[in-house]
């Protein structure tokens, strides 16, 4: 059990017969009336985000979540196949279980979340950044613009994003998995 003073981003709670993680919270002390906490909760079962207000001091049941690191092996018609790095146990997931499947490539590690009491699968979390290779992009011309211009690029997983003009084919770039946006070019040792 936890109270609203224990709220923090990422805390998993049981609420309305579902598991939620706190995405955002704000303690509010109005001039009139009691204090309360405004929250944004993300369902771990279906991914929907809801807004909810808790009165200050309310007791909430926290959910125990177990994180295990799995390695992505391959994708086929049955879904995505992952392997636990410690026990070598394999886990088969459908495409809906992974938030942005085009951000993962073979051999990449990701965290898989399980409910500790029941052992049920909850979801997958990608690392904050991934590095992917650009397979195709139009050549950018120097001096084409005075401002920061972007062009489309196709990555090795099939994902298409906007990249700066100086990015060429076969370069490796870093992508933010939360915003699915270009971050920087990865320096490669030659």
UniProtKB/Swiss-Prot annotation:
One of its GO terms (cellular component) is cytoplasm. It comes from the Bacteria. Disulfide bonds: none annotated. Signal peptide: none annotated. Keywords: Cytoplasm, Elongation factor, Protein biosynthesis. It is found in: Cytoplasm. Pathway: Protein biosynthesis; polypeptide chain elongation. Belongs to the elongation factor P family. This is Elongation factor P.
